[in-house]
A protein has these predicted regions:
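N-terminal binding-site loop/beta-alpha segment at the start of enzyme catalytic domains
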Residues: 1-72, 128
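Conserved, mostly hydrophobic/aromatic
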Residues: 7, 19, 39, 47, ...
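Short, acidic/polar
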Residues: 26-39, 83-98, 148-158, 228-233
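Beta/alpha (TIM)-barrel catalytic core signal, keyed to glycine-rich beta->alpha loops juxtaposed to Asp/Glu
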Residues: 55, 110-287
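A short, structured active-site edge motif that brings together acidic residues
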Residues: 70-82, 104-108, 168-170
Length: 287
């Protein structure tokens, strides 16, 4: 059984593996059903989607209706930066999901400095999120980010507004960058101090695609594929107490990530992770 932990100060106990519903963005109905059966079997109770994830919200809607909406901590995201566009997208997401509220609404990939100023300004997306919370359409508000600046930008966001959660890349290869590691550690310390939930992504990254990305690729990076490699990568992330791991967008690798988290084990040593890096030729996704 995948263990649970408090999701920050929200009062919800979430499985430490969160279903990244980006995996449903291009999935057929049959593939989506198989993925959601795995979610059910492993008793995942936290689902993370986004308005920009293709058909993901639509794929979740009938499954939520059939399995009991209130059994799940449901999160979505808006990538809009202005008030009106974000407010419209929030309501559209609720309609697509077939629900009257979500538990967590996140400002999606808010790392660009100019976009940050718009979103956090008086006529920005944050205002729409707060109004949605006040109206009972969302319960909590978070912020997500990709790239090397995400941890530092999240610290800046937390100084401006008491976000309930953050999400950023966290894996062995990325954390070998001293500047990124220092920013991540500072963010983690701030989140622990303030009761902010920490979600992590890109746990099973092998590196950027070499050459042109395959047309059928489910992830925009090349993932690890062997179960033993995924075991090490997942155990390393979950070896950091209190943080959560959002599963990758490759639906074919979902079972391996779930199996790794369910079996658990001690956190791999630095030597073990360096050996994995060297044997597989792992490289940072963000530089």
């Amino acid at each position: 059984m995948i263990p649970q932990a408090p999701f920050g100060r929200t009062g919800h106990q979430s499985r430490r593996l969160i279903f990244g519903a980006a995996a449903l963005s291009r999935a057929s109905e049959a593939d989506a059903d198989r993925a959601l059966e795995l979610v059910t079997r492993h008793q995942l109770d936290h689902l993370d989607t986004a308005a920009s994830y293709g058909d993901s919200e639509l794929r979740l809607a009938p499954w939520l209706a059939g399995n009991g909406r209130d059994r799940f901590f449901l999160a979505t995201k808006t990538g809009e930066r202005t008030y009106r566009a974000a407010a419209d997208q929030i309501r559209r997401s609720l309609a697509r999901l077939g629900v009257d509220h979500v538990d967590l609404l996140q400002l999606h990939n808010l790392v660009d400095a100019a976009e940050w100023e718009i979103a956090m300004g008086p006529d920005g997306a944050l205002r729409a999120a707060v109004e949605a919370r006040d109206a009972g359409l969302v319960r909590f508000i978070g912020v997500t980010g990709h790239g090397t600046t995400a941890p530092a930008q999240h610290q800046r966001s937390l100084e401006r507004f008491p976000f309930d959660s953050v999400l950023f890349p966290y894996n062995w290869t990325q954390l070998r960058d001293p500047a990124y590691a220092a920013a991540a550690d500072a963010l983690l310390a701030l989140c622990a101090e303030r009761g902010v939930a920490v979600q992590t992504i890109k746990s099973i990254t092998l590196g950027p695609w070499e050459g042109e990305r395959p047309a059928d690729a489910a992830t925009w990076y090349e993932p690890l594929r062997e179960q033993s490699d995924i075991d090490l990568a997942v155990r390393w992330v979950l070896g950091r107490p209190g943080i959560f791991l959002n599963t990758a967008s490759d639906i074919g690798l979902l079972a391996k990530q779930l199996d790794a988290a369910a079996r658990g084990g001690t956190r791999p040593s630095d030597a073990e992770m360096d050996a994995l890096l060297e044997s597989r030729g792992m490289t940072p996704l963000f530089v």
